[in-house]
Amino acid sequence: MLAKPFMWIILICTATVLASCTGVGRHSEQGFIYKDIQIDTTSASTGQGSTIQFKGNPLPLSGMSIQVGDKLRSVNLAKGDLSLIDVTDTGGSVRLINVVPSLDTTVCEQQTHYLSEKNQGLDQQIKLITISVDTPFAQDRFAKGAEINNVKFLSDFRGGAFGKTHGLLLEGPHVLARAVLVVDGHNVVRHLQVTPDLGHMPDMEKAFQVARSLVNEKG
């Protein structure tokens, strides 16, 4: 059993990191209201020894590093019905994988809405996936409340295996770093961006561009 002071440190760290996205965004009759959130165009490294910033403080990443050209690694994630699926199960499709700390936060919410609503028809050609450590039940509530039907939600709540296997797990708060990956039909990572600052958006348009180029290659 963890000592009480250590448990409190983890709880405080988790609350602090999730505050990086501070408060869930608003919706109107016209749909989701996008906020002016800074977009990072560079990428942090993944894996043990790498860090990302939050309010000027470094947060260490854990796990095995992954980079463009590597293959996505086999790990089981939970679907909405709690059944498991291997993240490498591509079905031969190009996939855009949206990785967020928690859907119950503004930046994460906006990042996922952007994936769903701004992909300009890519959802008809590739698979859109969002991975977080939220429980499958929380992901399902989010998807229904946000009326997002074109994104598959997968949960890494069972110990953060996806994060550890791909160097995207934040050690202290035990949430995933903010990232976007484009993976081809052979499970090769063709694009990877990890936001250097946890409170910033990734460059989703760049990810869309890479995914579209892979679709054109197949065509």
Where are these regions (language model features)?
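Thiol-/selenol-based redox modules, centered on thioredoxin-like
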Residues: 177-219
